[in-house]
A protein has these predicted regions:
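Glycine-biased, small-residue-rich flexible motifs in mid-sequence functional cores and linkers
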Residues: 17, 22-201
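Short hydrophobic alpha-helical segments enriched in small aliphatic residues
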Residues: 6-7, 13, 21
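Short loop/turn and low-complexity linker motifs enriched in small/turn-promoting residues
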Residues: 2-3
Length: 201
């Protein structure tokens, strides 16, 4: 379990450094080797998933959404246009729904009874929050927890984001600055993943 806690922290530190000057590990690894290591580390998160809700949603095409806490009105507009287009499809949005804009996207999905996967940065809820109960009862919601954290922390948030990205077929970000942990996630996925990875702009 300790290993699982360390993984997202190590990935963030290592990949952030390698994006600029290179770390000791990354200096000796080619792109394919980095991609293989990244894939193996993230895949391990799947063995620690707890699920509650409609598990069949995992069999659908998943799109991950990540938004910075510093999202601008323009970011919000682009995100709402994006989620509107998603609601015209059978795709399922997976996200931590933690930042203000991510919460707004969740509300949009709930209002339209569109399915979503809520990746938690903590253990599963003992009781479904009232505002999510209808979606849960309708089979439009699945909670995922990557275990080990009784409450939300920075480390658990990183673990949650990496895990959600691993499950997704496509990954979308709003704009972020270089100090954001989303920068590290985007850099790793864009360079070493064969998934669709885009920034809304």
């Amino acid at each position: 379990m300790l290993y699982l806690h360390i993984v997202p922290v190590w990935l963030n530190v290592c990949l952030r450094i390698s994006s600029s000057v290179g770390c000791l590990c990354c200096l000796f690894l080619k792109g394919a080797a980095k991609a293989w290591i990244l894939d193996k580390l993230i895949q391990r998160l799947r063995f620690f998933m707890d699920l509650s809700g409609n598990k069949d949603l995992l069999d659908r095409e998943l799109v991950a959404f990540f938004a910075s806490r510093k999202a601008t009105p323009h970011d919000t507009q682009l995100a709402l246009q994006w989620v509107e287009s998603i609601c015209q499809t059978d795709k399922v949005v997976i996200s931590g729904f933690h930042s203000p804009l991510e919460k707004e996207i969740l509300n949009y999905l709930l209002e339209r009874h569109h399915p979503a996967i809520f990746a938690l940065g903590r253990t599963l809820y003992k009781k479904v929050p009232p505002y999510l109960q209808t979606a849960f009862d309708e089979g439009n919601l699945l909670f995922i927890s990557f275990r080990g954290y009784s409450r939300h922390t920075w480390n658990s948030a990183q673990q949650r984001n990496w895990g959600a990205a691993d499950l997704a077929d496509e990954i979308y970000f709003t704009q972020f600055d270089n100090t954001s942990s989303l920068s590290t996630l985007y850099f790793a996925l864009d360079r070493y993943s064969d998934k669709v990875v885009r920034v809304l702009e």
